[in-house]
């Protein structure tokens, strides 16, 4: 069995954490950073870039770079078309998860097979199922889907080690907002209530800065930058940077040279100064949207502000001073806890939950809730709720319904999620039919409908005719838009791409090695011209040119062959130098050895586990020392 990790799959950044010796450790990625940008790019040469490398090339590859895909997960109408192939949000998310998995495996030195993945507390069933599908496509066994505020409270609460504490988690990420109230005591983490807004996050603050900049530029130059994709990508990056700087400075300069050109093809520059006061003014309505969910959570939990013991801020967007000030205002002046890293605490909690599920962490029980009510459509289009929001999960509820018409042979069960009174105003999760109902006057048949929500928050619905015993069940996964066959296909596709990526990386290593060998060999020849005959120099140069020529093409075997030839000529050069120096009684064998060694190193694959580095011992000297 491989290792289990906790993953915070974020809108802007993602984090992976693992338990080591019972303590959670955040794993740095291959670039050395503890957070990985949730960005995926398809380069023109077919390479798939993930993380910082994808983010770095976004300006020059706008149409083939995908960011903030989390905002689309669970939406089966969304996809991105790259080279005539459509990718779903699950597939793009899987690319991010694959990188986190690879980086964790590199750090641990062993396979990672299992994961707990976090989602916003206010994610719908479709979004949860889609996230689980993404994990499966990435080659992970998803142990549990956990709400982000719950994971944060788990990490924070266990660290504090206090009894009976009420924690408010205010989670403002890159694309979503959640607020949750939890009670922690004696190893039990129980969610009392949760609320939020899946369409509110740091991206919206960035967009306000972008809008402000485009308006300013249009006023100054009469040019609409929104029609220029490359300019807009530069503006988005500048806006994010400005937002971050305004968390610690009163103002920031936004300077973008050569942002576009005028009618006469003269380059134009964007140069603006944005103050924190102005930034807060243009984003005040976004901040105010977090007030209602906060008040709703208190109401649903039936507690007052004074009952809150600790306030935990989660998500990079909570670093904005205006957010901190609002939270203090809403909580009656309580100072938010500064002891947790808002970017990492969710992944840490996920790793702890993975430890709980794998039996590595004892005496911890996590009791989460369903964020939205679940029910079915009944006569007149009414939403009849079977499970109210903020019900602790896993849970199971049943209710008996009847037919609306005489001799009705079947009933259509339509499952909805939401808080509106009319079913059509809520989110349709799925539908199925129960047939074979015995003929009877309306109101006589008894149809028992059972809702079963598992620990991942994923819904199973069963309808049973008590008279005939006929039964039908649906696992609500339609919302993710993927059948098991599609998921299996995507898993195979992801595995194939992993092989492609590995092959491409190996090919690049061959190229790098070849280029290095040509450079080192030519440098050696240049440094030792007087000691190497012209005939040998010509042979070495001819072989080096062969490598140069091979590097112009795509035939890796041809490059390897050319490298082997150059390696052989280099070793001949080294041999010639040894013989020449021996004849002259010289002591420059080290230089000759360098020539041969350079050829041998560059022409061989050092990945062979049976090859070891060793010092060369002079046998005569060795005997003299005895």
From Swiss-Prot:
UniProt cross-references to Pfam families, sorted A to Z: HSP70
UniProtKB keywords: ATP-binding, Chaperone, Nucleotide-binding, Phosphoprotein, Stress response
Family the UniProt entry places it in: Belongs to the heat shock protein 70 family.
Give the species this sequence originates from.
Corynebacterium kroppenstedtii (strain DSM 44385 / JCM 11950 / CIP 105744 / CCUG 35717)
State the PANTHER family in the record: HEAT SHOCK PROTEIN 70KDA
Locate the region Disordered: 496-515, 569-626
Protein name (database record): Chaperone protein DnaK
- The yes or no answer to whether the keyword Chaperone is present is yes
Q: Which residues carry this modification: Phosphothreonine?
A: 176
The source's superkingdom equals Bacteria
Q: What induces it?
A: By stress conditions e.g. heat shock.
Q: Do you know which Gene3D superfamilies this protein is assigned to? A: 1.20.1270.10, 3.30.420.40, Actin, Chain A, domain 4 (3.90.640.10), Substrate Binding Domain Of DNAk, Chain A, domain 1 (2.60.34.10)
Tell me, what does this protein do in biology? Acts as a chaperone.
Spell out the Low complexity composition-biased ranges.
594-614
Q: List the disulfide bonds.
A: none
Q: Ranges of Basic and acidic residues compositional bias? A: 496-512
- Recorded GO terms, molecular function? ATP binding; ATP-dependent protein folding chaperone; unfolded protein binding
């Amino acid at each position: 069995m491989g290792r289990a990790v906790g993953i915070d799959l974020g809108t802007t950044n993602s984090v992976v954490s693992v338990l080591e010796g019972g303590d959670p450790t955040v794993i740095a990625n291959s670039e050395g950073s503890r957070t990985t940008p949730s960005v995926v790019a398809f380069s023109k040469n077919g390479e798939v870039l993930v993380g910082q490398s994808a983010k770095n090339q976004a300006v020059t590859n706008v149409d083939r770079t995908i960011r903030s895909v989390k905002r689309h997960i669970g939406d089966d109408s969304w996809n991105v078309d790259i080279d005539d192939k459509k990718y779903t949000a699950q597939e793009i998310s899987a690319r991010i998860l694959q990188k986190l998995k690879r980086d964790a495996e590199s750090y641990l030195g062993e396979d990672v097979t299992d994961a707990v993945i976090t989602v916003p507390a206010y994610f719908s069933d479709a979004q949860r199922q889609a996230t689980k599908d993404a994990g499966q496509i990435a080659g992970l066994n998803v142990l549990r889907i956990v709400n982000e505020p719950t994971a944060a409270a788990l990490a924070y609460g266990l660290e504090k080690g206090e009894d009976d504490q009420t924690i408010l988690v205010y989670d403002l990420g890159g694309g979503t907002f959640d607020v949750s109230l939890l009670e922690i005591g004696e190893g039990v983490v129980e969610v009392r209530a949760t609320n939020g807004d899946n369409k509110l996050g740091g991206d919206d603050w960035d967009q306000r800065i972008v809008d402000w900049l485009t308006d300013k530029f249009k006023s100054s130059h009469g040019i609409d930058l929104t029609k220029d994709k490359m300019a807009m990508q530069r503006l988005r990056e500048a806006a994010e940077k400005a937002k971050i700087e305004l968390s610690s400075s009163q103002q920031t300069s936004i300077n973008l040279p050569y942002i576009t050109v005028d009618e006469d093809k003269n380059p134009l520059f964007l140069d603006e100064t944005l103050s924190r006061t102005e930034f807060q003014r243009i984003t005040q309505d976004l901040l105010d949207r977090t007030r209602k969910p906060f008040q709703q959570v208190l109401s649903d939990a039936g507690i007052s502000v004074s009952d809150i013991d600790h306030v935990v801020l989660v998500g990079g967007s909570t670093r904005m001073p205006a957010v901190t000030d609002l939270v203090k205002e809403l909580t009656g002046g309580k100072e938010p806890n500064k002891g947790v890293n808002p970017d990492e605490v969710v992944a840490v909690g996920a790793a702890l939950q993975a430890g709980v599920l794998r039996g590595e962490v004892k005496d911890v029980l996590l009791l989460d809730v369903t964020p939205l009510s679940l029910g079915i459509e009944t006569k007149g289009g009414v939403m009849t709720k079977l499970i109210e929001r903020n019900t602790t999960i896993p849970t199971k509820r049943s209710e008996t319904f009847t037919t609306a018409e005489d001799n009705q042979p079947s009933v259509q069960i339509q499952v909805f999620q939401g808080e509106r009174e009319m079913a059509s105003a809520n989110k349709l999760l799925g539908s199925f039919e129960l047939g074979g109902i015995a003929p009877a006057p309306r109101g006589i048949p008894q149809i028992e409908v059972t809702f079963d929500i598992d620990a991942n928050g994923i819904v199973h619905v069963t309808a049973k005719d008590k008279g005939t015993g006929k039964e039908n069940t649906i696992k609500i996964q339609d919302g993710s838009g993927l059948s098991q066959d599609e998921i299996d296909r995507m898993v195979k596709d992801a595995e194939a791409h992993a092989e492609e990526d590995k092959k491409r990386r190996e090919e690049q290593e061959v190229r790098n090695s070849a280029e290095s060998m040509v450079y080192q060999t030519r440098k050696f020849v240049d440094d030792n011209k007087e000691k190497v005959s012209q005939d040998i120099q010509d042979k070495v140069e001819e072989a080096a040119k062969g490598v140069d020529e091979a590097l112009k093409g795509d035939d890796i075997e041809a490059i390897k062959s050319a490298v082997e030839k150059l390696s052989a000529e280099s070793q001949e050069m080294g041999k010639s130098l040894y013989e020449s120096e021996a004849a002259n009684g010289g002591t420059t064998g080290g230089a000759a050895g360098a020539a041969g060694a350079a050829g041998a190193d560059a022409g061989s694959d050092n990945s062979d586990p049976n090859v070891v580095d060793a010092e060369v011992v002079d046998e005569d000297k060795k005997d003299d020392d005895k």
